[in-house]
Amino acid sequence: MSSFIGWKKNSNSGGTPGASPTSSSPLNSTISNANSVSGLGPLGSISNTSSSSLSSSFQPIQIVNSNNNSPPLSSSSSSTSTYSTPNSSNDTIGKSSSSSVASAAAAGASSTSTYSSSSSLIDTSQFNNNYVGNIFGGQPINPNTEFGSSILNKFSKYLLNKGFNTEGIFKPHPELDNEIQNVKKNLIKDLSIGDMEQASLSTLTQNPLVIGEIMKQYLALLPEPLFSYQLYDSFLLTHSILSPTDRIWAYRFLLLYLPVGFRGAIKSVLGLLSRVHQCSESSKMNSESLAKIFSPVFLRPAEDMYYMKSDQSTLEEIVKLWIEEFDMISKPPTNPNPNSKVTILGTNNTLSQLQQQSNQHSSLPNISSLSSNLIQQQLQQQQQQQQQSHPTIGMSKITSSLSSSSLQVNLQTSPKSPQSPKLLLPTIPKDDQQQMTIVKQKPILSKPTPTTTPTLTPQTTNPPPVPASTLDNNNSNNNNNNNNNNSNNNNNNNNNNNNNNNNNNNITPNGSPLINKRLSIGGFALSPPGASTSFSSLSEQEVEDKVRKIKVSIDTMVSEQALLLIKNLLKSIEKEFNYNHIIKFSSIIRDAKKHMNESSEKQLSLTKANIREFIQEYPKPMSYNLLVSSIPKLDTTNFTEQEKKANDIKRASQVAADEISDYIYYFKLKISTFQLKEQVISTAQIFSKLKSILESPPPSLPTGSSWSDFENNSSNNNININNNINNSSSNNNNNNSSPNSSPLMGRLKTSNGLNSSSNSNVTPPTENQISADKATIRIIEVCSQEIKSRFGSMRSNLERVDINGAFEIGKHSRNVKAVLNDIYVQCKLIPPPDIKALPPGEDQLTTLRKALPPLFDRFVTQIDELTQHVFNNKASPEEITIIVDKLLFINRSLSM
């Protein structure tokens, strides 16, 4: 049987657990399980946290105290370990099991666990301390012995005696490869003909660098990391959420979740690494360099996936902290508060039975040492009907509908049910009024049937009539690209009604009212669609795990990726001046919008009216608003008919993209509340099709081409939309343009002869040349006006946002300041004087509100100077390129 530890705060209402502030969050509720965010695979796939280990990654070893001059390794564990009786609830830790230290963690001071041989997923016959097989064949650590691995113990003793202060002890030494191979062969030979305890490393080599390399190779072949696959998420969340002081206290309890063999190996390896770090002056290896080498030994996910790159720095910080604070972490944990309580659910143990069980395991704290009042409180807590996880790290959760009696019945009647859920990850308590609960195996939840969810016909509302002026404008766009123009302009008409529904409130999903109540839409309920994915070959628990992974994947990864793809498309459209390319880009957004509208309504009975109602009730955060409301109205008097159409298509694309972001935001918040697996699968299919549409190349690209090919062609084609410019310039190659330069500047360079062989002799363009390129004038005028308008909006928003919003504005201001200073340096211009720093206000928010407005004024002055520098014929073509590209970058960064 499996067990896990659930933590909860003490409550003053007779032991009723306090409400967790995140317990009802639709964004966080889905990660309260063993297979949380860190175990996600691609959309719709299962990341099996119990898969086979990666032979290329390191695995932990154990070092024991040497009888010589090695430093003592703190450990409260006993060498005694027993197999539990059928009534015990412990598992050995293997590739798919997790060790239980329920009793140990309950008392808060033990470091020894017992294991049930009947439920172990590891063949314990392999765990022979005198095993003479190939030690480099991936033999697992014995979880039932004090040291876990005898050969690892020998490596540690050897290096603690004569190698911990050797320079570069764990660095690669290619010149020693031959000696390393010879020592390995002789070691395997000695072990095959004798007892492992009798083997001596000193007779094989006197070079500690050789033993250090062999030790690393041994660790690399261990099948599971020292902290186990199951605790991967717990360690990352503990490090990310808790303060440095609380981390050390919490890590002590995480250590209790591992078998005694693993704990001994961890203390052995960390004892050696800590000693090497202490002698970093001679070894030339500190905690940081050691953490980079050994972080995979202690922590790695079961599957090395894309998110591992972002996790790697955190893993190194965790191992670095363990190395530096090893003496502190290795001490037995104690209850941080005398008011901490322990509840054992699902058992009928009396005080005498608890004492007897404690006496059977000498390493566990003596129950009799606890006061009688505390024991009585423990037994009274058994009758509580609901258990909740700690609000800080909600890794486990028990449904409130399950009482302790039902838990007990389930455990007694089906202790080895093949459908029992996997062991959930533990939770770490904060260092304040805490109540620790040891909870038995979570019973199987009843599967909801589609008939229990009524399907209501959503009430759709007719959109308001489209203005006649808009229709006339659309009808005027029927020329060469009639079909494409009509489709895009119709998108503009259909989506104009969304403008009033998009609020630029700086509200993050975590700050939404959805955190405190369940999402619902009046008069609307999701109907269960027919699932195309077959779960017939999966068990009920595997289906639940798969659905949970899909939920978390859509919530945390897929929705953000889709939003980023849309933003990149809008950026490409805004910077594009080729009419045909604009049509192709906008057609992709049009198809994506059509897919979201039709698929959502067909598979989930979601209409645009439902989405609009949801957005009105829960406004989108600023990052999801893709409509640029501050764009000044351009004077289109001198525009050609084709330029007017291109401008209309750009605005229609913005409206369509904003409507897609409405759907993405809706699913991001609602996915965690879907009860039926068919709803989750349909949502995953919708997002999968959306990503394929957004990632597809434009229709005109040949098969096998990519977006990068299209963008390169777009940047190198010198096609001018102005009929007055000579078309012969399109035959020149724009090879000298920077990768970040826009197609506009490519045309400007070509028209000014920058691609000719006499580049160095080219004089700055005359006023007539600059005036002739209307695109250059437009882009500088529009960007400067938009940027200054955004500064005005930031100034007004600064007066009503909270401290977090003010920090965001300050962060964007810092970026703008850096870019503008870069322009002045590259163009060799004299910057305006810096703003005099104001004295700090009463608090941070007041200080920001005083300091940022003068900075906005300075930005406006700098932008005016740069535009005049171009229009007054003082800028060279290179300077124009820099100014235009930087202004585009500032405008885009502020709009996001």
UniProtKB/Swiss-Prot annotation:
<feature type="region of interest" description="Disordered">
    <location>
        <begin position="375"/>
        <end position="514"/>
    </location>
</feature>
<dbReference type="GO" id="GO:0005737">
    <property type="term" value="C:cytoplasm"/>
</dbReference>
<feature type="compositionally biased region" description="Low complexity">
    <location>
        <begin position="751"/>
        <end position="761"/>
    </location>
</feature>
<feature type="compositionally biased region" description="Polar residues">
    <location>
        <begin position="702"/>
        <end position="711"/>
    </location>
</feature>
<feature type="compositionally biased region" description="Low complexity">
    <location>
        <begin position="10"/>
        <end position="26"/>
    </location>
</feature>
<feature type="compositionally biased region" description="Low complexity">
    <location>
        <begin position="448"/>
        <end position="460"/>
    </location>
</feature>
<keyword id="KW-0343">GTPase activation</keyword>
<feature type="compositionally biased region" description="Low complexity">
    <location>
        <begin position="400"/>
        <end position="427"/>
    </location>
</feature>
<feature type="compositionally biased region" description="Polar residues">
    <location>
        <begin position="27"/>
        <end position="38"/>
    </location>
</feature>
<protein>
    <recommendedName>
        <fullName>Rho GTPase-activating protein gacM</fullName>
    </recommendedName>
</protein>
<dbReference type="InterPro" id="IPR051854">
    <property type="entry name" value="Rho-type_GAP"/>
</dbReference>
<feature type="region of interest" description="Disordered">
    <location>
        <begin position="701"/>
        <end position="770"/>
    </location>
</feature>
<feature type="compositionally biased region" description="Low complexity">
    <location>
        <begin position="473"/>
        <end position="506"/>
    </location>
</feature>
<dbReference type="InterPro" id="IPR000198">
    <property type="entry name" value="RhoGAP_dom"/>
</dbReference>
<comment type="function">
    <text>Rho GTPase-activating protein involved in the signal transduction pathway.</text>
</comment>
<feature type="domain" description="Rho-GAP">
    <location>
        <begin position="139"/>
        <end position="330"/>
    </location>
</feature>
<feature type="compositionally biased region" description="Low complexity">
    <location>
        <begin position="712"/>
        <end position="743"/>
    </location>
</feature>
<feature type="site" description="Arginine finger; crucial for GTP hydrolysis by stabilizing the transition state">
    <location>
        <position position="171"/>
    </location>
</feature>
<feature type="region of interest" description="Disordered">
    <location>
        <begin position="1"/>
        <end position="97"/>
    </location>
</feature>
<feature type="compositionally biased region" description="Low complexity">
    <location>
        <begin position="375"/>
        <end position="391"/>
    </location>
</feature>
<feature type="compositionally biased region" description="Low complexity">
    <location>
        <begin position="65"/>
        <end position="97"/>
    </location>
</feature>
<dbReference type="Pfam" id="PF00620">
    <property type="entry name" value="RhoGAP"/>
</dbReference>
<dbReference type="GO" id="GO:0005096">
    <property type="term" value="F:GTPase activator activity"/>
</dbReference>
<dbReference type="InterPro" id="IPR008936">
    <property type="entry name" value="Rho_GTPase_activation_prot"/>
</dbReference>
<feature type="compositionally biased region" description="Low complexity">
    <location>
        <begin position="45"/>
        <end position="57"/>
    </location>
</feature>
<dbReference type="GO" id="GO:0007165">
    <property type="term" value="P:signal transduction"/>
</dbReference>
<keyword id="KW-0963">Cytoplasm</keyword>
